[in-house]
């Protein structure tokens, strides 16, 4: 997927930016005036993405600030009102889940119940946006220096975590997940997930790559850069997955052993066996013995005995915010000197998030500062300030009690279809509208390198077909599943339940997708109409 | 005769203390879980100590200062180790109310635990909830302090950058016109007059050549 899809598309975007020397709107307008809608669509997608993405930085800041306590606040459950036991919700779920759902998000039972804006996340969101503003304030002059830091620190922390992770008890169980299951490779869903992952991790279609490339020297060898960047991207992904899997194995082993201990305790207490008699090794035989000797009592106790299995613990695949804030914190609280590991981890998360925000911010600002209309009225600092302020104001939605549900909604639906469509139109535009031969000669004039046949084939045929395939798959998936659903936290039961989206949420989803995809045809139509009228005017004047 | 009396006393004891008796509490110890290799064996001497600790706790209750070790009865001792106990009044006729026993045990829980090197989890009194220590709450939550520090640093940095940007722009506006921003992508547009850039014609560094006529003298005065 990397070779077939990632590298060609990355090279294409870098080359377009370097050649046109403008942000996304201007670049596509130069290729063809009908296609400036592509640039606008990129801008809209980047804007929507930046609105919801900074909320992750908010949460990272929140956890970072809370890591300076002993013990860590998510490692112990708070007491209930009369101090006789632990809080009920915390008992049913785990302390890390409780801290995430109750203390951080204060989540409501469903997306309809909005609740009010909560001041603690709102403060952290404001701070997060101030930090982003600080980084993109001066444009690429400052972002270049910031990015040196935000890119190198995560590697440093990952190496530390790699060493720590591999030495944890039970880490090898998680690393066993690395062996690819051959039958999964035959499943087309796996390939589709791989294609989507490459697509979004490289940031294609957001306009950020074009914006950054437009600041390059014209003679810059963007082919070499495209290759290096995509290879490093994938290597980093594999590297961080080693760390993740070892931490995962540690957590799964820990939970499995806890589960076994609970079963042992339950049996010891119910049958008044000698303390320490039941161990992990003789558990099964003793269970059978008890079942045969005291059948009545055993059948009473049996419903409470959970079947502990290491495989099921490992199989609970989590991704996204669940992985970062629940699974990792659970693993961290069991390590020694957990405050240090926690601070390191959330600082790394913060720098990664800031790096992404800087990229998205540049993708938004470059077209705005390039356009003569806006930049003649306002200086660069004011434009970035206004954009940050607007984003922060809209982002307050995500600090409400139902905010996490809206976040998931934005996360799942903002970028998927729109980016696929944008990149498809980009590839077709460069190859067929602008002309592959013309682009090739432009590149040769700029960089002095000839375009090899591999890139030509990829750009003209393979990548567009692949994207069309992905697009069709996602559309059919959405249509076939009927109503879209989301995961809601049930405080009374202590785990997530699936609920349907209400109609207005579905309307918002439709609006999100439409606002970016409709730009392309609408602007094309608009340009056509205005041109048509201009030509008519010229004819009638003559 | 003596045998009959002994039999009577044991029967009364058996009636007072049995599983789920009125005012009886079940106790459960997990010695090996708590102490591992250093675990001691639970024998009659340990039971004696337990009865002594319960009697000690009851003596702290007003009106019960006369409680003796013999008034604490244990029964149904299992290998777990678990057993039931009751506290009787001095006449050994009835058991003391559960509420009194419960409050006495709760008040002295730490002493009882430490006598056996155990804690609330490994020495359990079923139906007597233990009072958990509340977590330490500092007066100002720590996170607000850290937040405040970082917030101030970021605001100051932004203010500095914005001010320096404004100052630089003001200096540029006063300086030679036509020179654009440093990080511009296009080449600097330098106003050109007859192929000679205007900048070097600035009088700042050069000497005035008096051979040339100044502006006023070109037109000879009348």
UniProtKB/Swiss-Prot annotation, chain B:
The keyword Signal applies. Residues 163-222 are cytoplasmic. Expressed on the apical surface of the proximal tubules in the renal cortex (at protein level). Kidney; collecting ducts and proximal tubule. Pancreas; beta cells of islets. Expressed in the cerebral cortex, hippocampus, brainstem and cerebellum. Its main location: membrane. GO terms for biological process: calcium-ion regulated exocytosis; insulin secretion involved in cellular response to glucose stimulus; positive regulation of amino acid transport; positive regulation of L-proline import across plasma membrane; SNARE complex assembly. The keyword Thylakoid does not apply. The chain crosses the membrane at residues 142-162. Glycans are attached at residues 76, 93. The modification Phosphothreonine is found at residues 214, 220. Residues 15-141 are extracellular. Keywords: Cell membrane, Glycoprotein, Membrane, Phosphoprotein, Signal, Transmembrane, Transmembrane helix. Residues 21-222 form the Collectrin-like domain. One of its GO terms (molecular function) is protein homodimerization activity. Belongs to the CLTRN family. Monomer. Homodimer. Homodimer; dimerization prevents CLTRN cleavage by BACE2. Interacts with SNAPIN. Interacts with SLC6A18; this interaction regulates the trafficking of SLC6A18 to the cell membrane and its amino acid transporter activity. Interacts with SLC6A19; this interaction regulates the trafficking of SLC6A19 to the cell membrane and its amino acid transporter activity. Interacts with SLC6A20B. PANTHER family: COLLECTRIN. Plays an important role in amino acid transport by acting as binding partner of amino acid transporters SLC6A18 and SLC6A19, regulating their trafficking on the cell surface and their activity. May also play a role in trafficking of amino acid transporters SLC3A1 and SLC7A9 to the renal cortical cell membrane. Regulator of SNARE complex function. Stimulator of beta cell replication. This is Collectrin. The gene is Cltrn.
């Amino acid at each position: 997927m990397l070779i077939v899809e990632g590298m060609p598309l990355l090279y294409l975007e870098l080359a377009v930016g370097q050649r046109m020397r403008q942000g996304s709107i201007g670049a596509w307008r130069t290729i063809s005036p009908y296609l400036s809608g592509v640039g606008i669509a990129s801008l809209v997608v980047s804007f929507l993405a930046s609105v919801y993405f900074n909320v992750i930085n908010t949460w990272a800041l929140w956890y970072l600030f809370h890591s300076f306590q002993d013990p860590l606040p998510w490692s112990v459950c708070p007491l209930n009102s009369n101090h006789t036991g632990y809080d009920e919700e915390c008992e049913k779920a785990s302390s890390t889940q409780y801290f995430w759902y109750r203390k951080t998000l204060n989540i409501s039972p469903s997306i309809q119940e909005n609740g009010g804006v909560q001041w603690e996340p709102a403060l952290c969101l404001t701070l997060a946006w101030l930090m982003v503003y600080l980084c993109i304030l001066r444009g690429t002059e400052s972002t270049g220096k910031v990015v040196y830091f935000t890119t190198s620190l995560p590697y440093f922390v990952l190496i530390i975590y790699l060493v720590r992770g591999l030495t944890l008890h039970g880490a090898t169980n998680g690393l066993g997940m690395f062996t690819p299951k051959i039958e999964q490779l035959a499943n087309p869903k796996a390939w589709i997930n791989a294609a989507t992952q490459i697509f979004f991790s490289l940031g294609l279609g957001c306009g950020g790559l074009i914006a950054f490339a437009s600041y390059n020297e014209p003679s810059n060898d963007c082919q070499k850069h495209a290759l290096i960047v995509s290879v490093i991207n994938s290597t980093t992904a594999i590297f961080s997955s080693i760390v993740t899997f070892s931490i995962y194995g540690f957590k799964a082993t820990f939970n499995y052993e806890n589960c076994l201990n609970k079963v042992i305790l339950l049996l010891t207490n119910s049958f008044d066996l000698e303390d320490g008699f039941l161990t992990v090794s003789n558990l099964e035989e003793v269970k059978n013995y008890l079942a045969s000797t005291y059948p009545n009592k055993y059948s009473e106790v049996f419903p409470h005995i959970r079947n502990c299995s290491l495989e099921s613990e490992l199989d609970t695949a989590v991704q996204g915010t669940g992985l970062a804030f629940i699974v990792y914190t659970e693993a961290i609280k069991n390590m020694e000197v957990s405050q240090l590991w926690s601070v390191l981890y959330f600082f790394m998360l913060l720098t990664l998030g800031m790096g992404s925000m800087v990229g998205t911010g540049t993708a938004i600002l470059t077209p705005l500062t390039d356009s003569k209309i806006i930049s003649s009225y306002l200086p660069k600092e004011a434009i970035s300030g206004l954009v940050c302020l607007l984003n922060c104001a809209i982002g307050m939605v995500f600090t409400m009690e139902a905010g996490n549900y809206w976040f998931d909604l934005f996360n799942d639906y903002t970028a998927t279809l729109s980016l696929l469509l944008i990149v498809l139109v980009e590839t077709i535009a460069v190859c067929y509208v602008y002309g592959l031969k013309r682009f090739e000669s432009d590149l040769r004039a700029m960089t002095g390198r000839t375009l090899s046949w591999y890139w030509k084939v990829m750009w003209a045929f393979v990548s567009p077909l692949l994207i069309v395939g992905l697009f069709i798959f996602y559309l059919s998936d959405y249509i076939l599943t009927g109503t879209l659903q989301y995961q809601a936290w049930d405080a009374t039961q202590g785990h997530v339940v699936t609920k349907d989206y209400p109609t207005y949420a579905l309307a918002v989803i439709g609006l999100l997708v439409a606002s970016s995809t409709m730009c392309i045809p609408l602007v094309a139509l608009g340009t056509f109409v205005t041109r048509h009228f201009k030509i008519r005017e010229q004819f009638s004047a003559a | 005769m003596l045998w009959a009396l002994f039999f009577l006393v044991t029967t009364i004891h058996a009636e007072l203390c049995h599983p789920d008796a009125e005012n009886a509490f079940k106790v459960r110890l997990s010695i090996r879980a708590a102490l591992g290799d250093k675990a001691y064996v639970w024998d009659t001497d340990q039971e004696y100590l337990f009865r002594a600790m319960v009697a000690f706790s009851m003596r702290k209750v007003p009106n019960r200062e006369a409680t003796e070790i013999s008034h604490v009865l244990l029964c149904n001792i299992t290998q777990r180790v678990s057993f039931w106990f009751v506290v009787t009044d001095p006449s050994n006729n009835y058991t003391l109310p559960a509420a009194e026993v419960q409050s006495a045990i709760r008040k002295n829980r730490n002493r009882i635990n430490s006598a056996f090197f155990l804690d609330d989890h490994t020495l359990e009194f079923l139906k007597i909830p233990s009072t958990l220590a509340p977590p330490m709450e500092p007066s100002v939550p720590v996170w607000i302090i850290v937040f405040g520090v970082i917030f101030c640093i970021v605001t100051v940095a932004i203010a500095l950058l914005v001010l320096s940007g404004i100052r630089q722009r003001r200096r540029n506006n006063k300086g030679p016109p036509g020179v654009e921003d440093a990080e511009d992508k296009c080449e600097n547009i330098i106003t050109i007059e007859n192929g000679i850039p205007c900048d070097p014609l600035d009088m700042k560094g050069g000497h005035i050549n008096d051979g040339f006529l100044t502006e006023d003298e070109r037109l000879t005065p009348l």
